[in-house]
């Protein structure tokens, strides 16, 4: 979007036509409200940017099908020129005509017709240039089908539009609709407006609507429309004095038969504009992020760098995009409905005044005044930015232009910076509503994303603090590493040819997050269908499983006007977090995933794990929808956004920690109930505090050794050429345990049956060495470096017999031989190291032996005794022998 500059923001409101509540559609579902349909169609209008068009910003839905549209606005319009009742100069008329045609031509390229062209919808900016307003009303209302008022103004409607009339459907049954207006209807409207400017007066003012319509239709019987109009309004002398090129424009615009009338594109190329057209440079839309074109191709720097700032005064807010300004306006307390009420655009009527005078037994009523609220009041109310500017008055200019390269520690910090640092410690819900904080975060992320992928590392760093909601869609794409010609790739996929999956997709979409106005709109359904189908077609080795629609929902919502980016994000997300989950036979993948999840429950909450296992409430009964949809099936979108903000920063094992965190929030209820009650509890999941869930899942993730969540069916490591780039940009906690380099100390795959038989997870020798802070000799490497002063995070319990232990053991480990470790009742036998084991309860306990079955049994006993964070060394003591890290106790003399 363009910067706000000298423009303002305006809002206008109208009602969509209401539908009966007792009528269903052909699919048996209730009819989609017309306001929802309009809201869905409106979204594409936000992407249409041109210097001759007022930028659409937002649409909000109120009660009783009310819609409020926010768009760029200018106070002056051609209506003001006509009020002066003076003919406009010929050169000005030519410039106005050409600029209007520029806007209309750009709209036509995007398949949009204005249809509501009139002097008060042709605005003038501070420099006197044209901006077309309300050009999307005809498009968003489905050519007027979804509202009870006509689109357009009788004096300016083309004859072919008037001839079709305004049909109304009865009982909401589709009838034969008139053909939608084409680009040529706008050319007629422009002709009438130019005629009015030339003569300095408005036409048809003395005629009522029916007479105007009749007069316009009779123009088809005359030879010269211009002369007839001039004679009718007593301005023939003025018309005769017009230069030939202006007369030619008027004649071409006011050609009665549309087949002979030029389109805006044809008229722009006409010889009459030969002197005007060189004054204007063709508009080239700037390349957006993730576009295939080179973003810096048209970048030119002036010789004097100060020239960049010559047009910038102290109004830094005006340099931000109109979308950002509106978002901040809302945060600063802006209320659209309140603004419209203050200007008396919205008037409340006492209910008693709406009662009929007579009411018969059959329900027929009489004496009710006509409700005129359903008609269009196209008054645009200017939204005051005073409250926002007052809120941001203490924000310095440097906040609008953050330095990304300089060392911030050497720069002086203002009070504003100190306040921001304090704000960063506040709860996320408060930060997201803090105007000043969001301004700084939006500007910072905007700068970083413009430098993507060069600034990928810094995007990761800032995303760990928080992600501003306005920048979430692009930030997620950056975190997922989306790059390349995503639009060309998406466009090349066949999304039209019928496939067997179509039927299931059609069934699932109307059930997917339909509480959301955007996703429940017909436009949302169509986009859902295309993105899902594109994914299915482009992944022939995978299949569509129910739940894929829920997985698609967050990406589609954030990138509603960019299906290619939604598809690219989804295609990058699934291999990372749900690798092979969508195979036709995915049982082995799901079973391994759920087994590892069971081990994670036992690792972090043994008491809960013991209880769930005793009552037979296994993850297969409740967790498959969690992980298959990455929680999008169980949480609403606003919770998913905060959850995924953190999920995307972690590796593929982070979902396990989210799952455990959810169970821990329900812990008391689960421990107090049996199998049937737990089933009922999960059939309608109780309210989950998502901020607490995120916080606890991060804590669980930090306590989990990386290799404890190893899965043989996880995404295989990328080739060395790619992985080196990924490793250099991704933080340690987002790296996978399977990432290279793979050594002899890494975890090995084991059969699923063996994995299921073990209650506690295995960790690799690599992780053990890392957590014990041991020094490795030879060619072995550890993934991280720890300081020598830090306390050990774990206790190694060696369960071999004492003779083997004396021959060589891990430094700092304790010996509890398996044969004498537990009593007949299953309690831990008292011994010299029992107290030490008890003191380490709560820290990581690694069970080491040389017989895998014994180590698994020992770990299971500890879990039964409610010892948390118990795990097994993969490969046993034999994995450690080649490292030279085993120590032998000094002989006692």
UniProtKB/Swiss-Prot annotation:
- Residues of the Protein kinase domain: 1-273
Q: Which PANTHER family does the entry link to?
A: SERINE/THREONINE-PROTEIN KINASE PLK, TBC1 DOMAIN CONTAINING KINASE
Protein localization: Cytoplasm; Cytoplasm, Cytoskeleton, Spindle; Midbody; Early endosome
Q: What is this protein called?
A: TBC domain-containing protein kinase-like protein
What note about domains is in the entry? The protein kinase domain is predicted to be catalytically inactive.
Q: Which residues cross the membrane?
A: none
Q: Which InterPro entries match?
A: Kinase-like_dom_sf, Prot_kinase_dom, Rab-GAP-TBC_dom, Rab-GAP_TBC_sf, Rhodanese-like_dom, Rhodanese-like_dom_sf
Q: Does the keyword RNA-binding apply?
A: no
State any GO BP term from the record.
cell population proliferation
Report quaternary structure and partners.
Answer: Component of the FERRY complex composed of five subunits, TBCK, PPP1R21, FERRY3, CRYZL1 and GATD1 with a ratio of 1:2:1:2:4, respectively.
Pfam families xrefs? Pkinase, RabGAP-TBC, Rhodanese
Q: Which UniProt keywords apply?
A: Cytoplasm, Cytoskeleton, Endosome
Where does it sit, as one GO cellular component term?
mitotic spindle
Q: Which family does it belong to?
A: Belongs to the protein kinase superfamily.
Record domain Rab-GAP TBC: where: 466-651
Q: Which PROSITE patterns does the UniProt record give?
A: PROTEIN_KINASE_DOM, TBC_RABGAP
| Function of the protein | Component of the FERRY complex (Five-subunit Endosomal Rab5 and RNA/ribosome intermediary). The FERRY complex directly interacts with mRNAs and RAB5A, and functions as a RAB5A effector involved in the localization and the distribution of specific mRNAs most likely by mediating their endosomal transport. The complex recruits mRNAs and ribosomes to early endosomes through direct mRNA-interaction. Also involved in the modulation of mTOR signaling and expression of mTOR complex components. Involved in the control of actin-cytoskeleton organization.
Repeat among the record's keywords?
no
């Amino acid at each position: 979007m363009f910067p706000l500059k000298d423009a303002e923001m305006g809002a206008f409101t109208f009602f969509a036509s209401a539908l009966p509540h007792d009528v269903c559609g052909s699919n048996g579902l209730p009819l989609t409200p017309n306001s929802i349909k309009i809201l869905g169609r409106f979204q594409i209008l936000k992407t249409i940017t041109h210097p001759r068009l007022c930028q659409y910003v937002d649409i909000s839905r109120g009660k009783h099908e009310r819609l409020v549209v926010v768009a760029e606005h200018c106070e002056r319009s051609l209506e003001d020129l006509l009020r002066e009742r003076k003919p406009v100069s010929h050169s000005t008329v030519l410039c106005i005509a050409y600029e209007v045609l520029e806007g209309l031509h750009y709209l036509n390229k995007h398949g949009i017709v204005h249809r509501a062209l009139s002097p008060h919808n042709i605005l003038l900016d501070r420099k006197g240039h044209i901006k077309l307003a309300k050009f999307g009303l005809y498009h968003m209302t489905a050519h007027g089908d979804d509202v009870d008022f006509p689109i357009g103004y009788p004096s300016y409607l083309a004859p072919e539009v008037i001839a079709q009339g305004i049909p109304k459907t009865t009982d909401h049954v589709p009838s034969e609709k008139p053909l939608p207006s084409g680009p040529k209807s706008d050319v007629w409207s422009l002709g009438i407006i130019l005629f009015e400017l030339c003569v300095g007066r408005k036409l048809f003012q003395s005629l009522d609507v029916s007479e105007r319509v009749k007069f316009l239709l009779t123009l088809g019987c005359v030879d010269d429309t211009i002369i007839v109009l001039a004679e009718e309004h007593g301005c023939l002398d003025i018309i005769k004095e017009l230069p030939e090129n202006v007369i030619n424009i008027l004649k071409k615009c006011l050609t009665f038969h549309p087949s002979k009338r030029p389109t805006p594109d044809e008229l722009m190329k006409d010889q009459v504009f030969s002197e005007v057209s060189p004054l204007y440079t063709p508009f080239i839309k700037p390349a957006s992020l993730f576009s295939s074109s080179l973003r810096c191709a048209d970048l030119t720097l002036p010789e004097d760098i100060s020239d960049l700032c010559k047009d910038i005064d102290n109004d830094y807010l005006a340099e931000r995009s109109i979308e950002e300004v509106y978002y901040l306006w809302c945060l600063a307390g802006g209320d659209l409905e309140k603004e419209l009420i203050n200007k008396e655009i919205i008037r409340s009527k006492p209910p008693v005044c709406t009662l009929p005078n007579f009411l018969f037994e059959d329900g027929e009523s009489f004496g009710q005044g006509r409700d005129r609220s359903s008609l269009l009041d196209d008054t645009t109310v200017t939204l005051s930015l005073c409250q926002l500017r007052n809120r941001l008055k203490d924000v310095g200019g440097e906040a609008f232009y953050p330095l990304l390269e300089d060392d911030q520690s050497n720069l002086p910090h203002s009070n504003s910076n100190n306040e921001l640092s304090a704000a960063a410690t506040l709860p996320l819900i408060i930060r997201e509503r803090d105007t000043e904080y969001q301004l700084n975060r939006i500007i910072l992320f905007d700068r970083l994303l413009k430098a993507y992928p060069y600034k990928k590392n810094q995007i990761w760093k800032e995303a760990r603090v928080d992600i501003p909601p306005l920048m979430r869609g692009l930030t997620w794409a950056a975190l997922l590493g989306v790059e390349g010609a995503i639009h060309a790739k998406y466009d090349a996929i066949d999304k039209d040819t019928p496939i067997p999956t179509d039927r299931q997709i059609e069934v699932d979409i109307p059930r997917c997050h339909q509480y959301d106005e955007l996703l429940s709109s017909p436009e949302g359904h169509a986009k859902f269908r295309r993105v899902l189908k594109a994914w299915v077609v482009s992944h022939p080795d995978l299949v569509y499983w129910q739940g894929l629609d829920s997985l698609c929902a967050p990406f589609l919502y954030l990138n509603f006007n960019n299906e290619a980016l939604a598809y690219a994000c989804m295609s990058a997300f699934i291999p990372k977090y749900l690798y092979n989950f969508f195979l036709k036979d995915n049982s082995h993948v799901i079973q391994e995933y759920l087994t590892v999840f069971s081990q994670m429950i036992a690792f972090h909450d043994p008491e809960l794990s013991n209880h769930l296992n005793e009552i037979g409430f296994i993850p297969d009964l409740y967790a498959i929808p969690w992980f298959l949809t990455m929680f999008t099936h169980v949480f609403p979108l606003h919770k998913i956004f905060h959850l995924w903000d953190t999920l995307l920063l972690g590796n593929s094992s982070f979902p396990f920690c989210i799952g455990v965190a959810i169970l821990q929030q329900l812990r008391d209820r689960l421990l107090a109930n049996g199998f049937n009650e737990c089933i009922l509890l999960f059939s309608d999941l109780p309210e989950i505090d998502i901020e607490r869930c995120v916080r606890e899942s991060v804590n669980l993730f930090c306590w989990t050794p990386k290799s404890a969540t190893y899965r043989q069916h996880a995404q295989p490591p990328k080739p060395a050429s790619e992985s080196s780039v990924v490793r250099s940009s991704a933080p340690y906690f987002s790296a996978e345990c399977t990432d290279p380099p793979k050594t002899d100390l890494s975890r090995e795959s084991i059969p699923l049956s063996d994995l299921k038989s073990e209650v506690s997870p295995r960790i690799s020798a690599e992780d053990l060495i890392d957590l014990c802070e041991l020094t490795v000799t030879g060619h072995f490497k550890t993934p991280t470096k720890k300081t020598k002063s830090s306390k050990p995070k774990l206790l190694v319990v060696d369960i071999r017999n004492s003779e083997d232990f004396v021959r060589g053991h891990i430094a700092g480990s304790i010996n509890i031989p398996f044969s004498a470790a537990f009593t007949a009742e299953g309690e831990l036998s008292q011994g010299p190291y029992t107290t030490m084991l008890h003191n380490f309860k709560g820290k990581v306990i690694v069970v080491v032996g040389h017989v895998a079955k014994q180590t698994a049994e020992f770990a299971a006993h500890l879990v039964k005794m409610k010892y948390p964070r118990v795990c097994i060394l993969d490969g046993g003591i034999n994995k450690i022998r080649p490292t030279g890290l085993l120590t032998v106790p000094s002989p006692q003399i």
